[in-house]
């Protein structure tokens, strides 16, 4: 009898494991159907959407809308934060928006003081942007990636772990504030000017995945913007906003909030906006301070570096060629690895996380290309892409969290490391980094080709 029970139990275990586990797929991405589908769709859209244009008047407007919930809410960011509910507000959270209109095209660059722009929010925006005469391709969504901000915006098991108990009112709140910020910024538009700037701040960033074995992305990318008598900046940087640990239960923007507040309080700037850049594998270099001392240190040090170049003035120009695009991104079947060679089957991932479409955002502002990706994108890979863009006489900003989420995309050479980013959060294969790099290079090449054709036609 015992032998029969043992055999039956073993059969049940084998069936269970076969239904839930699968070998890690290491098929090269170029051999899979999703790759061909992505390239085809992207090339189609690139051909159909040649909407770059320059008008005779440049208008720019800023808006800042409070996103702080009226009651205590879950905090998003750390799976091991228990409980998830905030105790109080340390500093308020906001949606910051810049609207730019060159007389032919209009765009909105948005940053929310959130962990990510949740996919549920993007679904709402797709429905409601039409009501205010906007469309999703005209919107560049980004987040500060603070790990101590509003949660409760993601249904499903993974959403609960990362962002706390789901409540539909939170995605609705975020979407409504984004829509309001776009309308306000549009109403605030005045004759404007713009400038792109870049500085290196290696002292505030480290490779948190492999330390000195890897590359860091030290570059802070900076849009300087004028709107009438007002002047603002929008900064992009790669260090994770994790100065505040999982022990913190107070709502806060972390160091991005310190950066923005310091710039407005200590310079002539009226607005200072921050967005996460390519943050995968990149952590803040905080020194030995504790919690809010750390966020204060990183935010202030970053602000002082930017203030130095602001003293000399930015090289503004009032002519702006604008192109915008949002292209579909297809990936292989998702897998959550439990070891180097074994993972949960895709159906478990889809049950726990949900199924959402993924897209890449692209803005072209003269010789600046802005790429918004639906993931924690590798700072190591970003450095390679910056250099590639410069070889084409283009500047490049890469921002994570554009309204979708595909986990982490680290450098492929770290895929088999037994660490959090590549083991638990790299869901789409051993060569996903190379795939993302190829897609971004395709977009850069298209812009470069169009620029060369335009220059030739104007000769």
Question: Locations of the language-model features?
Answer:
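Conserved beta-alpha junction segments in alpha/beta enzyme cores
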Residues: 2-9, 15-142, 149-270, 275-279, ...
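Anionic-ligand-binding alpha/beta catalytic cores of soluble enzymes and soluble regulatory domains
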Residues: 302-305, 309
